[in-house]
Every structure is written in C-alpha cells, then in structure tokens.
A protein has these predicted regions:
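Phosphate-binding and adjacent anionic-ligand microenvironments
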Residues: 1, 21-24, 42-43, 47-217
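Short Gly/Thr/Asp-enriched flexible loops that form oxyanion-binding sites at enzyme active sites
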Residues: 10-30
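N-terminal small/polar loop signature for handling phosphorylated ligands or for N-terminal nucleophile
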Residues: 1-13
C-alpha cells in the first residue's frame, strides 16, 4: 500500500497491489468510494448513522457516491466544482435544514468527514484509508476486492480524465461559445448512448425529455 499527500497535505493519492501483484493507481473517485464505504460501514456498526445525514460531492464526481448515500438512507447533494462549495453546502444544510454532514469528496482526490476541518483533509483521508485496508486484510480482502464488491452492489462505474487547455482571451471566448452551443443545441446522444437528463447549474434547470423543471438550487 502506497499513500501520498500533496505538499499542503489536503489531497490523497493511493497505489495498491492488484491480483497480478502489480501496482495499480486508484483514481480519486475510487479512493473516495472506498473511504465512504468504510465510513458508512463503521457508522452503521456503531449505530451512529444519522437520520438526516448528508453526503456531498461535486458535479464532476462519480454518481456512485450519490448512489451509495441513498442506498444507506442518507441524502445526496451535488455542488459545483471546488471543495469550498462542499463546505458551504454542509454549513447551510446543518444550520438551515437540521441535517448532519457526514462525508464530502471531489474526484480530484479531496475528502473530508465531519466538521473538524474547513477544507479537504489529506491526513485524515490517509489514516482512514490505512485503517480500511488493515480491516480488509484481516478478512483476506484487498481494496481492489472491496471495490469490486461495491461495483456488484451498485453497478460498475468507470471514469477517465481528459484535459483540454484554452489559453488567453481567445480561450475564454472559445469556452463561452462551447457553453452557448451546448445550451442552444443540447446533445441527444453521447458516444451512441441516449442522453436522458441534462442539468444546467447556471440556469438551475433539469431537462428530462420534453420536461423542464427547477434544478438542485
């Protein structure tokens, strides 16, 4: 097991041995899903899973996170990219709605449980992942084994990151044009798969077929 933090220790990277005994890099989504699974299992075992518990993730994070939250009777909330939005949502939900923030994550390797920190915490995440791996080892399982079990329960979720850079004022104009085009002519299919729902976080709308309703707010 290899655990690594970035210089300010707010993110966590992980490599584990796979079935072929080769090192396998885990994505931020995979790390977060494993930590979330461990947190939920521990809270349930201790009978401490809050009735109004909330799991918060960003819009670019795997939908598996929300599925796991709802599968354990918790609310799932998605916010814009950036951990500050996770923290703001957690504070608002606890203050205004009487909810309890349980766990937050973003696919860019940022994770947090509870209110001990105002930002993502790579040190806590490292400790949580190490404890999770040790518990799995006692049951003769690896993090990869547990990840596959989660996939069997909630469905396989795969993701890959592609970066495109648009520099300067021309780049900004290009980005704005892309967004306008998407809104004016939303795709009906992507890679041969039908688009069933479009969420517009600027206009705060959700489009399902011919129906348009208010978005997540």
């Amino acid at each position: 097991l290899i655990l690594a933090n970035d210089p300010d220790a707010d993110r966590l990277g992980v490599m584990v041995r796979n079935a072929e005994n080769n090192w396998q890099w885990l994505s931020g989504n995979q790390i977060g899903v494993l930590i979330l699974d461990f947190v939920l299992s521990a809270l349930k075992l201790q009978h401490r899973l809050p009735q109004k518990g909330v799991i918060i993730s960003t819009v670019v994070t795997s939908p598996l996170v929300s599925k796991m939250a709802r599968g354990n009777g918790l609310n799932a909330v998605e916010v814009l990219t950036g951990f500050k939005w996770i923290r703001q949502a957690a504070l608002r939900i606890e203050k205004e709605q009487g909810g309890k923030f349980v766990f937050g994550m973003e696919e860019s390797h940022g994770f947090l449980m509870g209110n001990h920190s105002g930002d993502k915490d790579g040190i806590w995440a490292s400790m949580a992942f190490a404890e999770m791996a040790a518990a799995l080892k006692q049951n003769k399982l690896t993090p990869i084994d547990r990840l596959n079990q989660i996939y069997q329960q909630y469905g396989v979720h795969l993701d890959a990151l592609e970066t495109q850079t648009f520099k300067g004022t021309k780049g900004i104009a290009k980005i704005q044009q892309i967004m306008r085009d998407l809104r004016n002519s939303p795709p009906v299919s992507v890679a041969g798969q039908a688009v069933v729902k479009i969420t517009d976080y600027l206009e705060n709308t959700i489009i399902c077929g011919n129906e348009t309703r208010q978005g997540p707010g």
